[in-house]
């Protein structure tokens, strides 16, 4: 009798990339990155340079939100609007700095990893993606594009 093991590794389009070629790719890349973060480490492709840069955004999240682990554990991830409002208590929507934009991405990626599933995302980890999309706009994507490259 042989054991049946899953060998599926989630590997999004931008995971192995070193940089983005167009501002139009930022939203898609960030969406893939948060989704990728929802998988267990052994079930996702190793990060290339671009995703390594995105992983470093967790440092910005620590600077802005202080204790992101406790924040992630205690936020109501089943309610996207409430999570966005909590983040807005730290970071108002008007004219976010590059560190604040990075911190939002880092916080949501941390939440996706914390609440993620073994071989697929959970509803809470997907909501971390929706929170990020709720918080960022086209101006933010333009700003973060420069940091990602």
UniProtKB/Swiss-Prot annotation:
InterPro entries: Poxvirus_B14/B22/C16 (IPR011212), Poxvirus_Bcl-2-like (IPR022819), Poxvirus_sf (IPR043018). GO terms for molecular function: molecular sequestering activity. Changing residue 130 to K: Disrupts self-association and NF-kappa-B inhibition by B14. Disulfide bonds: none annotated. It holds the Pfam family Poxv_Bcl-2-like. GO terms for biological process: symbiont-mediated suppression of host NF-kappaB cascade. One of its GO terms (cellular component) is cytoplasm. Keywords: Early protein, Host-virus interaction, Inhibition of host NF-kappa-B by virus. Homodimers. Interacts with host IKBKB; this interaction inhibits host NF-kappa-B activation. Contributes to virulence by binding to the host IKBKB subunit of the IKK complex and preventing host NF-kappa-B activation in response to pro-inflammatory stimuli such as TNF-alpha or IL1B. Mechanistically, sterically hinders the direct contact between the kinase domains of IKBKB in the IKK complex containing IKBKB, CHUK/IKKA and NEMO. Belongs to the orthopoxvirus OPG200 family. This is Protein OPG200. It comes from Vaccinia virus (strain Western Reserve) (VACV). The lineage of its organism: Viruses, Varidnaviria, Bamfordvirae, Nucleocytoviricota, Pokkesviricetes.
């Amino acid at each position: 009798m042989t054991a049946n093991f899953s060998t599926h590794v989630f590997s999004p389009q931008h995971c192995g990339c070193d940089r983005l070629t167009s501002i139009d790719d930022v939203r898609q890349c960030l969406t893939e990155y948060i989704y990728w973060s929802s998988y267990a480490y052994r079930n996702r492709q190793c990060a290339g340079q671009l995703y390594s840069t995105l992983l470093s955004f967790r440092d910005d999240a620590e600077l802005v939100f202080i204790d992101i682990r406790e924040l992630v554990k205690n936020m109501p991830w089943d309610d996207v609007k409430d999570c966005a409002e909590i983040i807005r208590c730290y970071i108002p929507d008007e004219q976010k700095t590059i560190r604040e934009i990075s911190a939002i991405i880092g916080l949501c990626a941390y939440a996706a990893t914390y609440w993620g599933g073994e071989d697929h995302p959970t509803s809470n980890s997907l909501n971390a993606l929706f929170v990020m999309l709720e918080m960022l706009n086209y101006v933010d994507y333009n700003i973060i594009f420069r940091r990602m490259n």
